[in-house]
Swiss-Prot record:
Coiled-coil ranges (or none): none
Keyword Transferase: yes
Organism: Rhizomucor pusillus
Source organism, top-level taxon: Eukaryota
Protein name: Alpha-1,3/1,6-mannosyltransferase ALG2
UniProt pathway annotation: Protein modification; protein glycosylation
Protein's GO biological process: protein glycosylation
Length: 455
């Protein structure tokens, strides 16, 4: 679309494994393929817990500020995240302030005024979902410190030159959450990179071999976080057995694989995995097996009916999507949810909760089922696929066609490039709150002092 190659810097807090990370990686790869220069700046990047493109040299990644703590005695996560981002951005301002045409910022908007004030680049902020709606306020101190943080999120997000969101659902929640932001967010649906999903299954990979089974696979892919409601899939699966919804010999021929991002540094990941395992074994009497990335390769026992796969790799994902008879997507009010799109492209029918983003991606009774978040209702839906009330193969084919027409990476990259070109040539908006500028100046001074002391 343009002969000019843009220099684009992506700023992302923690470049691990998750839907937000998948989106920014795909965005970076897509823009890079169109001839633009791309680099990632992040506060944390673990080569053993990341997407392949950030590890194999496809994308340049620089880590800054990882020496700062992620929490203070297990608390104040958001404040530490903001401080880490300030340090990262301070280093950019000190040494690379004129290196980029566009900053693509997502998840955390605290750095936007700093970039706005001290660089000449335009800022595109991608809102996966308002952070103020994702946090719990269980204590008085949490309520007290979240109040200014929430206001800061609204003010700093509004300073962006362009705001994009991942769905119509998120756009609606954005307008309700940030009434002072008059800019209308543009909807940019997350894509999937078809090339990454068209790879053949590598059955010689040891991490794939341990997953091989004669059982039929029901698959759930979600981070091990309580808000993802993974137990919905587990309870629905167990109900098939407990309520005799299918014959015992039929149930014995199925395995539920609960796969997802898992970080041993995150207490909730550790605790939630333990809770799910206890629920499966102690309440439902199901045989389980857990696979960690660091654990030695060992075949899953043949009688294991629930397998927990923590932080799977690309080869394992390819295998599981190839083997799965049904994909179970459990979160409610999910802002978008890339997993159902991945499943549909792999020709796997999807069961998802009938709220949030999946309502915009899954076609009910055509590419899968949209159901209330009720284990018994989900169990009935799973049973209906097992007894072939629904034609899973046909639904899978329809799902693949649907994704090919609406969620391709080239279409996403074209749209994103057009937004960036328009943004780069636009006249900067200098209007802003003086209080926010003051916050930006103080933040930069504070970050620079810390950074210089550390050096």
């Amino acid at each position: 679309m343009t002969s000019k190659s843009l220099n684009v810097a992506f700023i992302h807090p923690d470049l691990g494994i998750g839907g937000a990370e998948r989106l920014v990686v795909d965005a970076a790869v897509g823009i890079q393929k169109k001839g633009h220069q791309v680099i990632f700046y992040t506060s944390h990047h673990d080569p053993n817990h990341c997407f392949e493109e950030t590890r194999d040299g496809t994308l340049k990644v620089q880590v800054r500020g990882d020496w700062l703590p992620r929490t203070i005695f297990g608390r104040f996560y958001i404040l530490c995240a903001i401080l880490r981002q300030f340090v990262l951005v301070a280093s950019l301002i000190l040494w690379e302030r004129h290196s980029y045409d566009i900053f693509f910022v997502d998840q955390l908007s605290a750095c936007v005024p700093l970039l706005k004030w001290f660089t000449t680049a335009k800022i595109l902020f991608y809102c996966h979902f308002p952070d103020k709606l994702l946090t719990q306020r269980n204590s008085t101190i949490k309520k007290l410190y979240r109040a200014p943080v929430d206001k800061m999120e609204e003010l700093t997000t509004g300073m962006s030159d362009l705001i994009a969101v991942n769905s119509g659902f998120t756009a609606g929640m954005f307008k309700k959450s940030f009434p002072s932001v008059h800019q209308t967010p543009q909807i940019l649906y997350p894509p999937i990179n078809f090339d990454a999903y068209d790879r053949p299954v590598d059955r010689n990979d040891p991490t794939v071999k341990i997953l091989e089974t004669d059982k039929r696979v029901l698959l759930s892919i979600n981070r091990f976080e309580r808000k993802k409601n993974v137990e919905l899939a587990l309870r629905a699966f167990a109900a098939l057995k407990i309520k005799n919804m299918v014959p015992k010999d039929v149930f014995a021929n199925y395995r539920l694989v609960l796969a997802g991002g898992y970080d041993k540094r995150v207490r909730e990941n550790v605790e939630y995995l333990e809770e799910l395992d206890q629920l499966a074994t102690e309440e439902f009497g199901l045989q389980t097996f857990t696979i960690h990335p660091s654990s030695a390769a060992a075949d899953v026992p043949a009688d294991a009916q629930v397998v927990f796969l923590c932080s799977f790799n690309d080869a394992q994902r390819t295998f599981l999507l190839d083997q799965a008879k049904l994909l179970l997507y459990t979160p409610s009010n999910e802002h978008f949810g890339i997993t159902p799109v991945e499943g549909m492209y792999a020709s796997v029918p999807v069961i998802a909760v009938n709220t949030g983003g999946p309502v915009e991606t899954v076609k009910n009774k055509e590419t899968g089922l949209l159901l209330p978040s009720d284990p018994d209702v989900w169990a009935e839906g799973i049973r209906d696929f097992i007894i072939e009330k629904y034609n899973g193969k046909q639904m899978g084919q329809h799902g693949r066609q649907h994704v090919q027409s609406k969620f391709s990476l080239p279409a996403f990259a074209d749209r994103l490039e057009a937004m960036m070109i328009e943004l780069e040539t636009s006249t900067p908006d200098q209007s802003s709150s003086g209080a926010v500028y003051l916050l930006g100046a103080i933040g930069v001074l504070f970050a620079c002092i810390i950074y210089c002391i550390k050096q």
